Amino acid sequence: MQNLIVAVVAYLIGSVSFAVIVSAAMGLDDPRSYGSGNPGATNVLRSGNKKAAILTLIGDAFKGWLPVWFVVHYGARYGLDETSVAIASVAVFLGHLYPVFFRFKGGKGVATAAGVLLAINPILGVATLLTWLIVAFFTRYSSLAALAAAVFAPIFDGFLFGPHVIALAIVVMSSLLVWRHRGNIAKLMRGQESRIGDKKKADAAAKPAGGSDV
């Protein structure tokens, strides 16, 4: 019963779309209506409002971090264990990808996954974030950076902690993240992927194929 509650609460937290909320609060267009159509920080950046993009990034990462951190640090007193941490991790991630509050049309999950990993273990989270930053810095492709981070996150986890139940949750999240970027993979192969900082007007024509969004 406890794990069911964890799953529901984490999923509902994940379903809060900060890209949509921040954009509405700041009088910006709905991020689902321009660029890649993805409600994520990278697409919000295409509006030209860096503050909105940063707030979206922080919000999406925080919502991934919050439920997992709570279970990690306070779960034992409620009869929760590592399985509960794994459930919270996947549930909050699924909430971002398929939010009940926004007709199950969510983002790609990179920032939320980063928050989850930081809550599981700060070293794991920082190592994965550095992977994203390095690839993004040299290529300016958010999608390629996300794919690299998704591949290396389970590797970092295995190297640091060995086999454990939470590793399965990390593999599931990484697999879902790669799946959500399948359109980006195709665009990268065609040389048509948009780069970080591209404006929404320049990118609008590419919307049906998916964007390179966090």
UniProtKB/Swiss-Prot annotation:
<feature type="transmembrane region" description="Helical">
    <location>
        <begin position="159"/>
        <end position="179"/>
    </location>
</feature>
<feature type="transmembrane region" description="Helical">
    <location>
        <begin position="52"/>
        <end position="72"/>
    </location>
</feature>
<keyword id="KW-0594">Phospholipid biosynthesis</keyword>
<dbReference type="InterPro" id="IPR003811">
    <property type="entry name" value="G3P_acylTferase_PlsY"/>
</dbReference>
<comment type="similarity">
    <text>Belongs to the PlsY family.</text>
</comment>
<comment type="pathway">
    <text>Lipid metabolism; phospholipid metabolism.</text>
</comment>
<comment type="function">
    <text>Catalyzes the transfer of an acyl group from acyl-phosphate (acyl-PO(4)) to glycerol-3-phosphate (G3P) to form lysophosphatidic acid (LPA). This enzyme utilizes acyl-phosphate as fatty acyl donor, but not acyl-CoA or acyl-ACP.</text>
</comment>
<keyword id="KW-0997">Cell inner membrane</keyword>
<feature type="transmembrane region" description="Helical">
    <location>
        <begin position="82"/>
        <end position="102"/>
    </location>
</feature>
<keyword id="KW-0444">Lipid biosynthesis</keyword>
<feature type="transmembrane region" description="Helical">
    <location>
        <begin position="118"/>
        <end position="138"/>
    </location>
</feature>
<comment type="subunit">
    <text>Probably interacts with PlsX.</text>
</comment>
<keyword id="KW-0812">Transmembrane</keyword>
<feature type="transmembrane region" description="Helical">
    <location>
        <begin position="4"/>
        <end position="24"/>
    </location>
</feature>
<protein>
    <recommendedName>
        <fullName>Glycerol-3-phosphate acyltransferase</fullName>
        <ecNumber>2.3.1.275</ecNumber>
    </recommendedName>
</protein>
<keyword id="KW-0443">Lipid metabolism</keyword>
<keyword id="KW-0808">Transferase</keyword>
<dbReference type="GO" id="GO:0008654">
    <property type="term" value="P:phospholipid biosynthetic process"/>
</dbReference>
<keyword id="KW-1133">Transmembrane helix</keyword>
<dbReference type="Pfam" id="PF02660">
    <property type="entry name" value="G3P_acyltransf"/>
</dbReference>
<dbReference type="GO" id="GO:0005886">
    <property type="term" value="C:plasma membrane"/>
</dbReference>
<keyword id="KW-1003">Cell membrane</keyword>
<dbReference type="GO" id="GO:0043772">
    <property type="term" value="F:acyl-phosphate glycerol-3-phosphate acyltransferase activity"/>
</dbReference>
<keyword id="KW-1208">Phospholipid metabolism</keyword>
<keyword id="KW-0472">Membrane</keyword>
